[in-house]
């Protein structure tokens, strides 16, 4: 399995859009809710500067039901 470190907010959003996710609404603070109308899945994305921690990105992918390998290949 590849590494999920070194991804920034903008890169993650760009890839999530390829998987059909759309911005749904602003959540508390700097967090955003993204939704996939096809799969009816929601995921919460923190909009912070710098690299996303690997554990946080894994949690986002789990919520979105995206395999980490598929995410890495879509880069």
Model segments located where?
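Basic nucleic-acid-binding interfaces
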Residues: 1-75
């Amino acid at each position: 399995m590849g590494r999920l470190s070194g991804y920034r907010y903008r890169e993650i959003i760009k890839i999530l859009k390829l998987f059909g996710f759309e911005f749904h609404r602003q959540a508390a603070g700097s967090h955003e809710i993204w939704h996939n109308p096809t799969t009816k899945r929601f995921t919460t994305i923190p909009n912070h500067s710098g690299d996303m921690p690997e554990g946080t990105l894994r949690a986002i992918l789990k919520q979105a039901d995206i395999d980490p390998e598929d995410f890495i290949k879509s880069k």
